[in-house]
């Protein structure tokens, strides 16, 4: 049961608390509220940080879908997207769903796993609104589905084996940019670092049919100390690729 502050007279929030096993508590560090029909998370003692929400329809995520480089971008190469190969993906650390959305917008079917109940609630709300959108709703319903649960368990319990398992464990950020500061300060105080992240690699390798992709900051060590088959490097991050079979 995770404590959260909510408005007492909003039945939608009461329902969300029941669904995600959240405990309404007026002394909680975080609050959930609806702002213009968008479920929003706020850190109550730092109101200047603003709210965190999931929005696939507008803003930076939508801009990346339209102008982000398509199948030429690093994440697409990392999961093996190419002509004649559109892999199925399990995102074992879904977070706010941005990377999963990029892959879905390029044609992949993505199953999202998120273990933190507040993050899962935000993600489900973002998906709810995206499913209703006239432009992206039809393919979003087909390609992005959410599962709430620990990846450590879910990766061993899924019956349908995906081509790719994608992991982006929470890692302490060193950057000082305003966006990273705002989101990561809220997020890291909410969920903390994924201290058990090393335990994800083995079940991910068991589940994936073709490859496991791990997104890491450029300064981070290899997940579980295991050297990847190859790396794809970007300005601040890298994608460590553990190949099991050709994409073909």
Curated annotation (Swiss-Prot):
A molecular function (GO) term: rRNA (guanine-N2-)-methyltransferase activity
Pfam family, one: SAM_MT
Secretion signal span: none
Broad class of the protein's primary localization: cytoplasm
Keywords noted in UniProt: Cytoplasm, Methyltransferase, rRNA processing, S-adenosyl-L-methionine, Transferase
Keyword Transferase: yes
GO cellular component: cytoplasm
Subcellular localization(s) per the UniProt record: Cytoplasm
Catalytic activity field: guanosine(1516) in 16S rRNA + S-adenosyl-L-methionine = N(2)-methylguanosine(1516) in 16S rRNA + S-adenosyl-L-homocysteine + H(+)
Binding site for S-adenosyl-L-methionine: 98-99, 114-115, 150-151, 168
Enzyme Commission number: 2.1.1.242
Organism domain of life: Bacteria
PANTHER family: RIBOSOMAL RNA SMALL SUBUNIT METHYLTRANSFERASE J
Stated role: Specifically methylates the guanosine in position 1516 of 16S rRNA.
The family this protein is said to belong to: Belongs to the methyltransferase superfamily. RsmJ family.
Protein's name in the database: Ribosomal RNA small subunit methyltransferase J
Organism name: Shewanella amazonensis (strain ATCC BAA-1098 / SB2B)
Protein's gene: rsmJ
């Amino acid at each position: 049961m995770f404590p959260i502050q909510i408005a007492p007279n909003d039945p939608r929030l009461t329902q969300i608390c029941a669904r995600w096993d959240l405990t309404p508590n007026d002394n909680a560090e975080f609050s959930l509220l609806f702002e213009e029909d968008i479920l929003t998370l706020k850190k109550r003692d730092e109101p200047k940080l603003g709210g965190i929400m999931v929005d696939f329809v507008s803003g930076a995520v939508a801009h990346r879908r339209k102008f982000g480089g398509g199948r030429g971008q690093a994440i697409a190469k990392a999961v093996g997207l190419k002509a004649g190969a559109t892999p199925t993906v399990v995102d074992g650390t879904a977070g706010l769903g941005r990377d999963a959305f990029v892959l879905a917008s390029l044609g992949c079917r993505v199953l999202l796993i998120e273990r933190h109940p507040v993050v899962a609630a935000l993600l489900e709300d973002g998906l709810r609104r995206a499913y209703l959108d006239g432009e992206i709703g039809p393919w979003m319903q087909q390609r992005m589905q959410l599962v709430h649960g620990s990846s450590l368990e879910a990766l061993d319990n899924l019956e349908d084996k995906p081509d790719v398992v994608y992991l982006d464990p929470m890692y302490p950020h060193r950057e000082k940019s305003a966006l990273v500061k705002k989101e990561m300060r809220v997020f890291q105080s909410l969920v903390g670092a994924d201290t058990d992240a090393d335990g994800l690699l083995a079940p991910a390798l068991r589940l994936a049919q073709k490859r496991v992709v791990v997104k890491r900051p450029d300064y981070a060590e290899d997940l579980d100390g295991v050297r990847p088959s190859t790396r794809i490097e970007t300005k601040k991050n890298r994608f460590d690729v553990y190949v099991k079979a050709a994409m073909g």
